[in-house]
């Protein structure tokens, strides 16, 4: 069973020249980019850059439904989602790698379901797959747990927003973690975010606040060890999928067949 990786800002490639590119059409249009398929350990792995190969898509315009549908149609059932995040606590500085266990949605107007009809309601109390999380958090230096609040973007938070997020106990702030996680759940795909802290958010940092140029520079600085960690997380996953946490449609009549 194929594994998937959805790369975030600055994470546009994953394999060498021996990987094959696959173009996939979906009922929701094309995904962000052609999907590349290669091998990591005992696994066949499909890689998709969330924002496109040249960062064509801002967080609010990413074709999330097409991306997840395309991966599932290729046989992907388990997905790691590397992403860039801001930290809402000084305890997690730039370069920290965190595997969150909770998510808060503060986006608006995004296409966040495949079930516009049919009365389908997925369980989402625990948004991330515990098996995939364990594979990543078992690696050295990875912080286990935390709440990631997802904002609409593409702008960064005001200081007041950032301080409010921190006061609620949120740990990380991001722009792409939703609806990606819930769409994966609707397609019964195991999903776990792996977050690289690129900055202290505006309510924590002094000076001018968060700047995109600094975020991308920090991500680029940390890309080699971050990619290495994702490779190691993939290698740590069992070949056969045994997790049932994300199989949310048992006994439910769906309005269409999943790919």
Swiss-Prot record:
Residue positions binding substrate: 175, 199-201
InterPro entries xref list: MTAP (IPR010044), Nucleoside_phosphorylase_d (IPR000845), Nucleoside_phosphorylase_sf (IPR035994)
CDD domains the UniProt entry points to: MTAP_SsMTAPII_like_MTIP
GO molecular function, a single term: S-methyl-5-thioadenosine phosphorylase activity
Substrates-to-products reaction catalysed: S-methyl-5'-thioadenosine + phosphate = 5-(methylsulfanyl)-alpha-D-ribose 1-phosphate + adenine
Biological process terms in GO annotation: L-methionine salvage from methylthioadenosine; purine ribonucleoside salvage
Pathway(s) served: Amino-acid biosynthesis; L-methionine biosynthesis via salvage pathway; S-methyl-5-thio-alpha-D-ribose 1-phosphate from S-methyl-5'-thioadenosine (phosphorylase route): step 1/1
EC code: 2.4.2.28
Keywords of the record: Glycosyltransferase, Purine salvage, Transferase
Annotated site, Important for substrate specificity, chain positions: 157, 212
Gene3D superfamilies referenced in this protein's UniProt entry, alphabetically: Nucleoside phosphorylase domain
Cellular compartments per GO CC: cytosol
Binding of phosphate, residues: 9, 50-51, 176
Family that this chain belongs to: Belongs to the PNP/MTAP phosphorylase family. MTAP subfamily.
Subunit comment: Homohexamer. Dimer of a homotrimer.
Chain's role: Catalyzes the reversible phosphorylation of S-methyl-5'-thioadenosine (MTA) to adenine and 5-methylthioribose-1-phosphate. Involved in the breakdown of MTA, a major by-product of polyamine biosynthesis. Responsible for the first step in the methionine salvage pathway after MTA has been generated from S-adenosylmethionine. Has broad substrate specificity with 6-aminopurine nucleosides as preferred substrates.
Protein name per its UniProtKB record: S-methyl-5'-thioadenosine phosphorylase
Native source species: Mycolicibacterium smegmatis (strain ATCC 700084 / mc(2)155)
